[in-house]
Amino acid sequence: MIFYTADLHFLYEPLLSSRPFATVEEMDETLIRNWNETVSPDDTVYLVGDIGYNEGQVPHQLLSRLTGHKHLIRGNHDTGYEDAASLYRYFETITDFNEIDDGETHILLCHYPIIYRKRGYMIHGHIHQSRGQEYQLLKELPRVLNAGVDINFYRPVTLEELIENNRAFYSGEWDDLIPPPPHTPRGDKGWLPATPDFRPIPERPNGQ
């Protein structure tokens, strides 16, 4: 089975203001538990960007606990790790862009949303649960799907689940399913993604 997810942001404390967790440890452990309860060792997961927050070392102790065959489509917070090449320990492929077939459905994968009206679906991350200008645009593009954990119950989801969760988010039904984080007004993102910063993908080390 194929699953999709994005914007985990392991170890990133500022996101607590827009997520329903009291601590980074609670957030990280919930994301890992939800992942492993959903994904079997034989399943495939496309992580559409933003493992953590682009600084220091790769979060090895967290990535090593995630099950399944994993593929990373890099986000703007996946390019600045001091040991970025070590990501190949956990991901079978690392790209900035990918195209796959999920059954008979064609899928375009990129961290940033792309206007897409062709066959299949475009799956992205980056915008979290933002209700900014992009919300009004993307709600008119039902083939462009947000895989971010913030609107997908903090777990990887299938294409069918992704379609339904996005429909609920852009129709307003999602607001009744997931309450806003404490001290955050409903519909207020509280944090805006950084400007995209593309850097070369590190070469796969010999032997990995």
What are the residue ranges of the model-derived segments?
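Residue-identity detector for glutamine
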Residues: Q57, Q61, Q129, Q133-Q136, ...
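Conserved beta-sheet core of the metallophosphoesterase superfamily
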Residues: L87-P179, T184
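Core catalytic region of metal-dependent phosphoesterases/phosphodiesterases
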Residues: F3-D101
